[in-house]
Amino acid sequence: LHYPLRRQRQMCIRDSILQKTSKLTDEEYAIMKTHVENSTKMIRYLPDMDYVIPAVVGHHERYDGTGYPRGLAGQNIPYMARILTIADCFDAMTAKRPYKQALSVEYAVNELEKNSGTQFDPVLVKKFVELIHEGKISIA
């Protein structure tokens, strides 16, 4: 689920925004946030894929309620969205991009743990980190 969403974001957002090395302007950030709506529209055309829409819509919600698009908090964020949020952020940190070097797995794990309970579901972060340490999550 995560990879197709990342590819969709790349298809719908201008490269000048995706590869920008400096801070996004308010306008660019608003454009970047449209990938949630665009992804949802694309999924509606795929047979038998409606079940992933809550995860797609909610993957930028934050556990403390400060995310978007609806400002949901805690258990009100769909379960799969809470998982996707962790995977998406971990990938964003550990993947090399044209505008940044990949961060180490150790650094990414520390960031997940540091933001556990605010940005991320603390129970799911703990499980995600356990799976990394057990070698059950493949890291490319």
Model-derived features: where do they sit?
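Alpha-helical scaffolding flanking metal-ion-dependent phosphate/phosphodiester catalytic sites
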Residues: 10-125
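Intrinsically disordered or compositionally simple regulatory linkers and C-terminal tails
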Residues: 134-140
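Single conserved hydrophobic/aromatic residue that forms the stacking wall/gate
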Residues: 1-9, 13
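Alpha-helical interaction/regulatory segments in DNA maintenance proteins
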Residues: 128-132
